[in-house]
Amino acid sequence: VELSIDIRSTLAQSKARVARMVKEQARVIARRRGLGIEVLKIREENPVPLDPGLLRLTKNICKSAGIDYEIMPSGAGHDAMQMAKITPAAMIFVPSRRGISHNPLEWTDPDDIALGAQLLMETLIRVGNEKF
């Protein structure tokens, strides 16, 4: 049996703690069942903080445009992790029906896509004009 786990968090120490707990429990279960176990770390990436100025800017644009928003941490390995190493980075999420994303069942209402695009456009204009 092969199992892979993607442990996500905005805190590196939380990811490490969960990884240790999973390994310990897997070894306990394997021992109890008389099985062998091999644990391999395929990849480990440290969380990258997003730019507070860009986050503040997008929040302020939402407020002034009457766009409902929610500040959400993301523990996923998005392109923003790589970009944040060389430039200020932030992410804009739009809601998907029933919270399903990265899946064939994902559906986002076109009006929400339009609002997300409007927010992105206004953010880019202000950043381009250095108004943040």
Task: Give each language-model segment a name.
Residues 1-17, 27, 42-43:
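Midchain, well-structured core segments that form catalytic/ion-binding scaffolds
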Residues 21-33, 57-65, 82, 119-127:
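Generic non-transmembrane alpha-helical segments
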Residues 36, 40, 44-95:
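Active-site-adjacent substrate-binding region
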Residues 1-8, 37-40, 97-104:
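A short small-residue
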Residues 13-14, 19-25, 94-132:
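His/Asp/Glu-rich mid-to-C-terminal helical/loop segments that flank catalytic regions of hydrolases
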Residues 24-30, 41-52, 79-86, 110-118, ...:
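Noncatalytic linker/hinge segments flanking ATPase motor cores
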